[in-house]
Amino acid sequence: MFYPDPFDVIIIGGGHAGTEAAMAAARMGQQTLLLTHNIDTLGQMSCNPAIGGIGKGHLVKEVDALGGLMAKAIDQAGIQFRILNASKGPAVRATRAQADRVLYRQAVRTALENQPNLMIFQQAVEDLIVENDRVVGAVTQMGLKFRAKAVVLTVGTFLDGKIHIGLDNYSGGRAGDPPSIPLSRRLRELPLRVGRLKTGTPPRIDARTIDFSVLAQQHGDNPMPVFSFMGNASQHPQQVPCYITHTNEKTHDVIRSNLDRSPMYAGVIEGVGPRYCPSIEDKVMRFADRNQHQIFLEPEGLTSNEIYPNGISTSLPFDVQMQIVRSMQGMENAKIVRPGYAIEYDFFDPRDLKPTLESKFIQGLFFAGQINGTTGYEEAAAQGLLAGLNAARLSADKEGWAPARSQAYLGVLVDDLCTLGTKEPYRMFTSRAEYRLMLREDNADLRLTEIGRELGLVDDERWARFNEKLENIERERQRLKSTWVTPSAEAAAEVNAHLTAPLSREASGEDLLRRPEMTYEKLTTLTPFAPALTDEQAAEQVEIQVKYEGYIARQQDEIEKQLRNENTLLPATLDYRQVSGLSNEVIAKLNDHKPASIGQASRISGVTPAAISILLVWLKKQGMLRRSA
């Protein structure tokens, strides 16, 4: 039977991509249906209990700038917040938070259940209704049919999912959940390229069986960072530390002696695993010279005894997992409460998608998340938001939208996927972006919130806060530009006390702030330049904009030059191991593909813009810079 009411947009799957897609479409006023096999697992963290990190935190901030859910949810659920790369420049600083799984799931579900225009329905989807190469609905397990103008697939690892523990395997979407086999078969009937990928997760440990007294603690930052531009630290729950242990030679011996029982090394798994989140058996074999690997013991929540040992993802048999865990300091008597496992699943070649994440072959069908070959909650959320907003626009007969690489990490992500595709689970890094000095966490709202407002994603409260911030930045910059101090002025002595070299000429507040030893906080304690802004986000923006103004302008010039390097020739006989500064991944891919030009090299999956810059510098130094006519 058909459900009596039609919808504008149907979302299939309630993970990180699906929840953002559903929220985006509903925020834009479209009647949206979220279909999930289990309402209780909406927003479930299937693997690590954390949000953010290098590159990933940037995506979370961008999702938030467009009115998304993830940043708000983690602000309510984060039990340890840190800024990574805090001592480095603002382009690569990244926020990361440990999460209480239960609180995170509750925050997501509460937001979904209180979102106007959104209906949630619990039933697994087994089929799509496709008419004349256009999707017009979905069919659930019990044969109930829903009609819609657009459908978004956000099915994670569920498509023909197979779980491996040692040489044993069984069908599953993730531990404790069934796979989606009928839907997988149906999608394989469509004109889409399909492959298999693999990911894994570590065993979970009972905290009561760990001796934390012998382990180093890792605390969060104080003051506590905040993820959402609308958030504040008072929303955070109780904060707790993580702990650090290490693998050792005993651990590595256990792994080496049991590789014949690993499904990866025995050839049982055909899917390709994530390069940047390898299993512990992969790490031991790939880095044979390392006698230890750092393992972070991360709490899964304030009311749970489960510990997530970040760094020992494995699909080895359970008895071997026990030996691995108990070989490490502090874990000699540890008990496993959930075994680690690998899961392989279907993904669809993202080169078959438009930049809007709509299929090139089936009109109205959108793909987001791990089905596109990515790995990570943040990558999934960003794609979900983009697919959801474009499904909403399509259902309203409007043109699709996708950010450019120069606008957002989301633009980089989508361009990489749709242009280059991927043969391994793709994760975001800052090194993937050419424009990273302009694509910072701190300015995600300045880049995207106005666009989000035009698209219908940003509500009145966020829009008012954003405009107030803009006004504060502009007013403060004008104040600092127009406030001066001279070497002979009474205030000069106070200013000179904070400078490495005393004033030799008249200087404005902005001139002083450009000095490396001067910070905005320090400057605004000085009599001529007080008081400081009470808006901390605006104050941070003023400092970064002033200090990095010249660098940003220079980067824009570099971008224009980069375009001219498209036709720079690469010698056919070049062994890229000669080029210092390239990563092992880039060297392997360049030696394998042997691109004829910089342009070709730049389009090889995994060859980053930073690697292209290194190549250009090397060619120039060698006197080998040649361009085709």
Swiss-Prot record:
| Major subcellular location class | cytoplasm
- Record GO biological process: regulation of cytoplasmic translational fidelity; response to UV; tRNA methylation; tRNA wobble base 5-methoxycarbonylmethyl-2-thiouridinylation; tRNA wobble uridine modification
Q: Where in the cell is it found?
A: Cytoplasm
Signal sequence coordinates: none
InterPro entries associated with the record: FAD/NAD-bd_sf, GIDA_C_N, MnmG, MnmG-rel, MnmG-rel_CS, MnmG_C, MnmG_C_subdom, MnmG_C_subdom_sf
Cofactor(s) the record lists: FAD
- Which Pfam family, any one, appears in the UniProt record? GIDA
Q: Which family does it belong to?
A: Belongs to the MnmG family.
Q: What is this protein called?
A: tRNA uridine 5-carboxymethylaminomethyl modification enzyme MnmG
Organism of derivation: Escherichia coli (strain K12)
Phylogenetic placement of the source organism: Bacteria, Pseudomonadati, Pseudomonadota, Gammaproteobacteria, Enterobacterales
From the UniProt record, report the name of the gene that encodes this protein: mnmG
